[in-house]
Regions:
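Cofactor-binding beta-sheet edge motifs in enzyme active sites
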Residues: 1-169
Length: 169
């Protein structure tokens, strides 16, 4: 979170036309309850981006998407912790609101929290999370071949072949 309350999402996935930059930012925006425009996505530069095993069809959404969700949840927790120490609080994407106790109803904006995090507090408003899964949806492909078989020799001749591939999101 920068001092204006905007987010930077740093991912290792490469957007090869599948839209993962947008999809992963949408996941983060959903968890952080902020407009998509409040998130800048920086992706796939081996000099500074985190490791990602690769962009393989919908597995980017499932695997890197889960890491994005977990990371945004961790960041929400840090925002709430810095926004109000030892009180029951809620966060609606714009401000932290105290729900109970003598400070009930008081709020502090996300930009004020982000600025405070840069000034002598021990809570840094950033999170790094990894996620892996034994289950990841593969891309789907179907192929159909038209062949001719010589019944005397057993020789097979390929006459035509058609394929369709679903590369996922």
């Amino acid at each position: 979170v920068n001092d204006e309350g905007f987010y930077t999402l740093l991912i290792g996935a490469a957007d090869m036309g599948t839209g993962c930059d947008t999809t992963l930012a949408q996941i983060a925006a959903e968890v952080l309850e902020c407009p998509l425009d409040n998130i800048t996505t920086l992706s796939a530069d081996t000099d500074w981006s985190p490791y990602d095993s690769g962009s393989y069809a919908s597995s980017t959404t499932y695997v890197t998407g889960k890491a994005t969700e977990k990371c945004a949840l961790e960041l929400r927790g840090k925002i709430c912790a810095l926004g109000c120490d030892k009180e029951q609080v809620s966060f609606d994407g714009r401000e932290v609101r105290v729900e109970e106790g003598e400070n009930a109803g008081k709020t502090i904006s996300l930009s004020d929290i982000a600025t405070a995090s840069m000034n002598g507090n021990s809570i840094e408003l950033q999170a790094t999370v990894t996620h892996s899964s034994e289950i990841s949806p593969p891309p789907y492909m179907v192929g159909a071949a038209e062949i001719e078989v010589d019944t005397e020799t057993g020789e097979v001749t390929l006459l035509d072949y058609a394929a369709a591939v679903d590369c996922g999101t």
